[in-house]
């Protein structure tokens, strides 16, 4: 059971982590050893680079995640998952239950066929 304040604590922790990350990015932009020149104008400060760096980091993270999970969304992986699920959980059902599953599937397909425009769903598509 979760405590009532857990959600707000998790959100505040996330905000704190984002703030620390922004500080780290800003400090890395200054370079090692400090900077002896006067601080730049507020519009051109290293803080103005944080949104761009965050966007670049998030885009690369999303791209890498999408590429690494691309195999999962392919038809072979999904078909394998469904086949394994059927073998593990549905293969030993009784004939009455299997007949009910088939009739439910047929009913669902008929409803989908009735909702589909005739121009898009020809009879040969459903055979």
Curated annotation (Swiss-Prot):
Signal peptide: 1-27
InterPro entries, A to Z: APOC4
Main location (coarse class): secreted
tRNA processing among keywords: no
Keywords attached to this entry: Lipid transport, Secreted, Signal, Transport
Any Gene Ontology CC annotation: very-low-density lipoprotein particle
Transport found in the keyword field: yes
Subcellular localization, as worded in the UniProt entry: Secreted
Similarity comment: Belongs to the apolipoprotein C4 family.
Protein name, per record: Apolipoprotein C-IV
Species this protein is from: Orcinus orca
